[in-house]
């Protein structure tokens, strides 16, 4: 019996070792239990890897070759093995969903181009989404259906279970970190254009709003009133953080885009994302203006004018403090706005550098 027990343990050890060796050889190590992995092909992997590493919620990104005909390959043999240059993305699902991660991916690829991205042409530069979790297939399919409605032409993104993955040579790993200014077909700044989910926020009923808001907040957001200049909460606030819709909590503006226009109301050069605000013509007060409203709450925020600083884009979003709630940078994570912290920090650093140059 002892011999039989020993043999069972021995064969189990061999089996586990074989599985680990197989996973290692294909570059598909399983992430930790609280992490997820997806493999994305989008042209030259140098740029896509650097881009993915900039996205909040991504734990690690590395370059490799996916879904070829053979279990081994290298950069010189890709035309023979038919692997796609791909990026292995390990991410934290508590911080970013697969759906949102794919939307960031879609921002930097041409989804209808066949075997070509940027200046790179060939099968190795095809687009593809390769999954190891079968449950991801439905998420991927739904994301592609939504994308198809937005683009002209048939989507050419390959979707398959991962197979024959090989980690790329060390020379290719973190290439743009090793070679700043090296070739990259992707605009890495697009990672800083934060995506704000529209299904994460809802507009309360009018009854709830009347209980939740102060009289001034209600009159401003629901009846398009204007608060007094220089006598409002945020017109001269300089603290780092995010400004959200007082009615829904949807992120609207960043302290990094706030500046002193001298008008007496909070002024911003742009919203945190172009989709979070809507515009309507306003001909009240016998003059033409452009009203700014929140996307989900449809709350009146203020107006936008074209007399802003040219170096900031030339716009002045003149917004009522009563339409906003400010969340300090130190509280953003615990209040569920952690994904916007990198945007705030990068923007504040850029603003600091610009201020130094101007003085």
From Swiss-Prot:
One of its GO terms (cellular component) is cytoplasm. The keyword Ribonucleoprotein does not apply. Keywords: Multifunctional enzyme, Oxidoreductase. It comes from the Bacteria. The active site is at residues 44, 318. InterPro entries: Met_Sox_Rdtase_MsrA_dom (IPR002569), Met_Sox_Rdtase_MsrA_sf (IPR036509), Met_Sox_Rdtase_MsrB (IPR028427), Met_Sox_Rdtase_MsrB_dom (IPR002579), Mss4-like_sf (IPR011057). Its EC number is 1.8.4.11, 1.8.4.12. NCBIfam families: msrA (TIGR00401), peptide-methionine (R)-S-oxide reductase MsrB (TIGR00357). HAMAP family: MsrA (MF_01401). This is Peptide methionine sulfoxide reductase MsrA/MsrB. The gene is msrAB.
């Amino acid at each position: 019996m002892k011999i039989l027990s020993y043999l069972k343990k021995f064969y189990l050890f061999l089996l586990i070792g074989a599985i680990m060796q197989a996973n290692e050889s294909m570059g598909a190590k399983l992430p930790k239990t609280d992490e997820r992995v997806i493999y994305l092909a989008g042209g030259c992997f140098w740029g896509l890897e650097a881009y993915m590493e900039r996205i909040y919620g991504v734990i690690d990104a590395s370059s490799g070759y996916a879904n070829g005909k053979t279990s081994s390959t290298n950069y010189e043999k890709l035309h023979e093995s038919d692997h796609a240059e791909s990026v292995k993305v390990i991410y934290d699902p508590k911080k970013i969903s697969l759906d949102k991660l794919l939307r960031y991916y879609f921002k930097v690829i041409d989804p209808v181009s066949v075997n070509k991205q940027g200046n790179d042409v060939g099968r190795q530069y095809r687009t593809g989404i390769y999954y190891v979790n079968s449950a991801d297939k439905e998420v991927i399919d739904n994301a592609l259906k939504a994308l198809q409605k937005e683009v002209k032409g048939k989507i050419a993104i390959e979707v398959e279970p991962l197979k024959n993955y090989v980690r790329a040579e060390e020379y290719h790993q973190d290439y743009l970190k090793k070679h700043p200014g090296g070739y990259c077909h992707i605009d890495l700044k697009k990672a800083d254009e934060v995506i704000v989910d529209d299904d994460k926020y809802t507009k309360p009923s009018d009854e709830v709003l009347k209980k939740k808001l102060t009289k001034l907040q209600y009159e401003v957001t629901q009846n398009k009133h204007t608060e007094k200049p220089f006598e409002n909460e945020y017109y001269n606030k300089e603290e780092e953080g995010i400004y959200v819709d007082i009615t829904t909590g949807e992120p609207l503006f960043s302290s990094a885009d706030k500046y002193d226009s001298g008008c007496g109301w909070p002024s911003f050069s742009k919203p945190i994302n172009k989709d979070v605000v809507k515009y309507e013509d306003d001909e009240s007060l016998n003059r033409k203006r452009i009203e700014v409203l929140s996307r989900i709450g449809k709350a009146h925020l203020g107006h936008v004018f074209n007399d802003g600083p040219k170096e900031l884009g030339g716009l002045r979003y003149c917004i009522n403090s009563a339409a906003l709630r400010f969340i300090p940078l130190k509280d953003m994570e615990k209040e569920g706005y952690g994904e916007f912290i990198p945007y705030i920090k990068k923007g504040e650093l850029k603003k600091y550098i610009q201020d130094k140059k101007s003085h």
